[in-house]
Amino acid sequence: MAAPIAIPYQSFYSAAKAAINSLTLALRNEVRPFGIQVCAVQPGDIRTGFTAARKKSHAGSDIYKSLDHAVAVMERDEQNGMAPEAVAKIILKAANAKKCRALYTVGAQYKLFTLINKLLPATTVNWLVGRIYR
């Protein structure tokens, strides 16, 4: 979900995900005349070994307090994320669709986040996200 909603302390990751969505939308138009479909899947947090493999290395000073909290929120979300099999089902469905959607958001909570992101002003969404990760 880092593409539509930029996550604090993951600025490069969020930017890369947003770029993938832009690439998907542009490429989709470019290859449409050839009967080729392109889509991107936005799965949100998935339970994998990613959290356990995360390396943390910084001094324990107050300057890192908000970073520590943000990482704790990310780790909790990752550990409680959806099973990889659930995401695989959506990817398989998209791959087998006669006409796929441009963007697939996986999971009810992430669909809700995407809707909120579309309905509220960007400043409000950014403020809310900042409150979650602060």
Stretches with model-predicted labels:
Residues 1-5, 45:
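Active-site segment of SDR-like NAD(P)-dependent oxidoreductases
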Residues 16:
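Active-site helix of classical SDR
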Residues 58-134:
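C-terminal tail/cap regions
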Residues 5, 26-37:
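Active-site-adjacent segment of SDR/Rossmann-fold oxidoreductases
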Residues 11, 19-22:
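Conserved cofactor-binding/catalytic machinery of classical short-chain dehydrogenase/reductase
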Residues 32-78:
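C-terminal beta-strand-loop-alpha-helix "lid" module of Rossmann-like NAD(P)-dependent dehydrogenases
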Residues 5-11:
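Active-site loop immediately N-terminal to the catalytic Tyr-X3-Lys motif
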